[in-house]
Amino acid sequence: MAHIVTLNTPSREDWITQLANVVTSPDELLRLLNVDADEKLLAGREARRLFPLRVPRAFIARMEKGNPNDPLLRQVLTAEEEFIVAPGYSTDPLEEQHSVVPGLLHKYRNRALLLVKGGCAVNCRYCFRRHFPYAENQGTRRNWQTAMDYIAAHPQLDEIIFSGGDPLMAKDHELDWLMTLLEAIPHVKRLRIHSRLPIVIPARITETLASRFQRSSLQVILVNHVNHANEIDGEFRAAMAMLRQAGVTLLNQSVLLRGVNDNAQTLADLSNALFDAGVMPYYLHVLDRVQGAAHFMVSDDEAREIMRELLTLISGYMVPKLAREIGGEPSKTPLDLGLKQR
């Protein structure tokens, strides 16, 4: 068994300490970045009543000071556009608010999604679950055990997805308990974890967690949620190296966001940075139509044009699949790029 390299150094804050010290005030966030709050930014402060602001300081450190249009800042800063009630947008765009048991969504035939934790380290303003009733789907051992009983009773389920919120908000001992239960179910072969924590607080990838993944009888897949190359730093690359040593398959999915990554060169830079970190670009999602996020929307026609250009900038294996998720559909829906017609 390969030795797992530890990332714990005297200067490295414990991830739980970092969680307790996140920024929750728009005013403090702008002050830390030396951004002068104009009338528009000031008006956006009230959007935290709709969806709280929450940003780890490690993520803020990667933002450009003095730039109100920084692509990382734009993903997390409250905006007055969140008050717009846009036609065609919903508080439940993927029709997820009906669990088979508390916290378990059986959306696809062979896969079920377990909402491990409702909280996140960062609140992304475009989040499609910003209105999700987490209070009714608590991440408790009682609910987790009920979910495991359901999984055990459905032999078609060979892959379980840990989601949230953010599943890595669970502590290492909680994840160990969940994995032990899953490993005892013979028909479950794969564990997929979707998380933004490794990018916003790379210290979350502890030696204990990596070692637990390495010992698992399950195939473990981590799907990172990274939208811009500027998010990727040395700590993230080191965390990914530790997970690769542990045999974890590393993927990434992004959301195509107006004013963040809505051009081909930015997406090419992201794919290159991910690949250099040992992470394979996987999906590029068009925005889920959740109320409060319409200002991030990139049209399908624009998305196709961006993807066609992206194909000319990087190798094909680094091009993510452009897709959307539609409530009630049995899988993600790829967007046809119209290449045959050109």
Where are these regions (language model features)?
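Flexible, acidic/Gly-rich N-terminal and inter-domain linker regions that tether
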Residues: 1-106
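N-terminal pre-triad scaffold of radical SAM enzymes
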Residues: 52-55, 98-129
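C-terminal accessory regions of radical SAM enzymes
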Residues: 304-342
